[in-house]
């Protein structure tokens, strides 16, 4: 698979406590098959962050890659928006 054909997702970092690993929550909306109501779905992915640049609350883009560990199949592409620290 070429790099530009791999699946990319945009989500929010919910954990950066691991070394070179972040946990990203990706939220999507879908219609209920019977009732038609919009329902929010969310899924967590672990992603490889080589330089530890992403912090908790950041909006990031991750890309599918070869398995890096038992649970890590994505890598950080870029930080789209940094979290505001209050």
UniProtKB/Swiss-Prot annotation:
GO CC, alphabetical: cytosolic small ribosomal subunit
Subunit architecture: Part of the 30S ribosomal subunit.
Name of the protein in its database record: Small ribosomal subunit protein uS17
Entry function: One of the primary rRNA binding proteins, it binds specifically to the 5'-end of 16S ribosomal RNA.
Keywords on record: Ribonucleoprotein, Ribosomal protein, RNA-binding, rRNA-binding
Gene3D superfamilies to which the protein is assigned, alphabetical: Nucleic acid-binding proteins
A Pfam family per the record: Ribosomal_S17
Keyword Ligase: no
Gene Ontology terms, MF aspect: rRNA binding; structural constituent of ribosome
Organism field: Streptococcus uberis (strain ATCC BAA-854 / 0140J)
Gene this protein is translated from: rpsQ
């Amino acid at each position: 698979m070429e790099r530009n054909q791999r699946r990319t997702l945009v989500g929010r970092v919910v954990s950066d406590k691991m070394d070179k690993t972040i946990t990203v929550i990706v939220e999507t909306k879908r219609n209920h098959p019977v009732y038609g109501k919009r329902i929010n779905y969310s899924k967590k992915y672990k992603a490889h962050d080589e330089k530890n640049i992403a912090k908790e609350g950041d909006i990031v883009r991750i890309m599918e890659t070869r398995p890096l560990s038992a649970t890590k199949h994505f890598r950080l592409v870029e930080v789209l928006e940094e979290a505001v620290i209050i």
